[in-house]
Design a protein with these regions (language model features):
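Rossmann-like adenosine-cofactor binding region
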Residues: 48-151
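Residues at the starts of beta-strands that form the adenosine-phosphate
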Residues: 41-42
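Phosphate-binding beta-alpha-beta segment of Rossmann-like dinucleotide-binding domains, i.e.
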Residues: 1-19, 34
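Short, flexible hinge/linker loops that cap or flank conserved catalytic cores
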Residues: 12-16, 37, 96-97, 155
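Rossmann-like dinucleotide-binding domain for NAD(H)/NADP(H)
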Residues: 101, 109-211
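Gly/Ala-rich phosphate-binding loop of Rossmann-like dinucleotide-binding domains
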Residues: 33, 37, 122-123
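N-terminal Rossmann-fold NAD(P) dinucleotide-binding loop
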Residues: 29-30
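Glycine-rich Rossmann-fold phosphate-binding loop(s) that bind the pyrophosphate
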Residues: 25-26
């Protein structure tokens, strides 16, 4: 800015026309896909648990395999729960299938990504970049090669990796929701017996929940 030389920084990419791949087309995955489409990014998704025909209602292309999505997507955004099936779903074998210009985004659960393999993929130039809001271990081990390289701004990783402390939601509106919604949930349960957004309903039922 001091030199007023717009040619000094490296060129950045254009998002329009790049393929946005969503793994896990639930509520958050769908909301993310809609935002990507607003930037004229073609969207495709992989989710074996979404009913057939849902892609027609959403207007997004569906892939029948994870490999197909990884082969084609310029951006891969993760939106699955952490289960035995999804743990380390992004690993050395899946990262090598991704395009060299691709970017991996994980705002879901840290255990979905093998960060040892991600370190190797970034350092080896197999993918262009990654952005993580979640990690398998939180807070992370500062001695882990990927975390250390990020913390010391090593040249090979500079500008290619973003890390936030499980706080991608952090905004004034997000903080207001964080305070209001739990209270609304408790009030609804105590006054109406309705249990919303519960991840352990089966366990509560075992102990006499009214849900």
């Amino acid at each position: 800015m001091k030199r007023w030389d717009w040619t000094a920084p490296p060129l950045i990419g254009r998002v329009r026309g790049n393929c946005f791949g969503v793994i896990g087309m639930g509520r958050i995955g769908t909301a993310t896909a809609r935002r990507a489409r607003a930037f004229d990014m073609p969207v495709l998704f992989y989710d074996p648990y979404v009913p057939d025909g849902q892609e027609l209602a959403l207007g997004f292309e569906r892939t029948r395999s994870l490999d197909d999505l990884l082969d084609r997507a310029d951006v891969v955004s993760l939106h699955t729960p952490l289960t035995d099936e999804t743990r380390r779903m992004i690993n050395a074998a899946t990262l090598v299938r991704m395009r060299k210009n691709s970017i991996l985004i994980n705002t879901a659960r840290g255990g979905i990504v093998d960060i040892d393999a991600l370190h190797d993929a970034l350092k080896g130039g197999m993918i262009a970049g990654a952005a993580l809001d979640v990690l398998p271990q939180e807070p992370p081990d500062p001695a882990h090669p990927l975390i250390r390289a990020y913390g010391t701004n090593e040249p090979w990783l500079s500008g290619r990796f973003l890390l936030s402390p499980h706080a991608a939601f952090y905004s004034a509106a997000g903080m207001a929701d964080l305070r209001r919604k739990p209270v609304e949930t408790v009030v609804a349960y105590l006054t109406e017996g309705k249990l919303r957004n519960c991840v352990n309903a089966a366990l509560l039922a075992q102990y006499g929940s009214r849900s």
